[in-house]
């Protein structure tokens, strides 16, 4: 099924994290449209995933709420670390636009979290020097207005009403700060999925909804929306589902007399459909993933955590390929343990995570690790190498604290 085409979305090209739980000092560079995080249990994959969730929640619900629900500094700051928690994103708004760097440092006082530093920086032209067009500390700072801020432009001093307020979130609501507004839209538009089969069985209030929720508990609402607004797309999604669940005949969302919405699935041999609560976990998970990946108005960034759960191993190669297709319009961040999912991936798309002897996460691209490019060049698949121990980590039957072994010829291509 061909993916719909969209304008070039914003892309994160690099991410640096300091002092966030096990991520004491981790950098991801030259990120691809699809980035897959691989590693043993407890290596930090879900923590990287949560960094995106933390930033998105901080923008959409407020820093304090995101901070408090994760246990504040006591639980968030890396054990034995000092100083603020820091995040730094390097991204482009469109494919050929200048790189913009967004830096956020969060500290804590007895009254709660404070934004210790927050700035935006870019460089105009190939020979220009980087300069900050937004620079705030503890609620006070300067910003340059306009669509193309320049180092010579006038800086306007601003003061926010709280030291925990994010300047990008506040100023990004004003039309006179289009670059700041673009970042705010980008981050608040991220979609981080923690899909579970149980949640997809929910019986929600009737009413069409455009996008799948984090847990998938509005799957019936999205099916209703697609049926009403994108009937051809829904037909294609269900055709895909039938290829994986051959006896599946149709999927419906029917409104009950009390205003709730029932998700119904019908097997071909039978006359009557069954309620979603009686459908298999794998069928519901596959339907939810297809609905998310073929969203008619896709998010700029989508996260999927361990999509292999409840799915037959032979379905994972195709699912990985569909994720890559979807990455043409949504940057994808995926965590996995599955060798079957890995077999469809390129070594440049996969980052291997491991905890060192101090307990902190280290991360290298698969293409940076000793021996991996050579084995791939000889025809091996990443999943095979993962299962046979060529990454040096990840075997739960023989755990150790050996560090990952990067190549000596520098970083990945």
How would you name each of these model-derived features?
Residues 2-7, 320-413:
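C-terminal lobe/lid and adjacent interdomain/linker elements of RecA-like ASCE P-loop ATPase modules
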Residues 2-24:
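N-terminal pre-Walker A segment at the start of P-loop NTPase domains
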Residues 26-32, 294-297:
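Phosphate-binding P-loop
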Residues 32-70, 120, 286-287, 335-338:
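Phosphate-binding glycine-rich loops of NTP-binding sites
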Residues 47-113:
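Conserved P-loop NTP-binding catalytic core
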Residues 79-82, 95, 293-297, 324-328, ...:
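Conserved catalytic network of the ASCE P-loop NTPase/AAA+ motor domain
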Residues 94-239:
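Electropositive, glycine-dotted interaction segments
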Residues 239-294, 301-317:
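Conserved ABC ATPase signature
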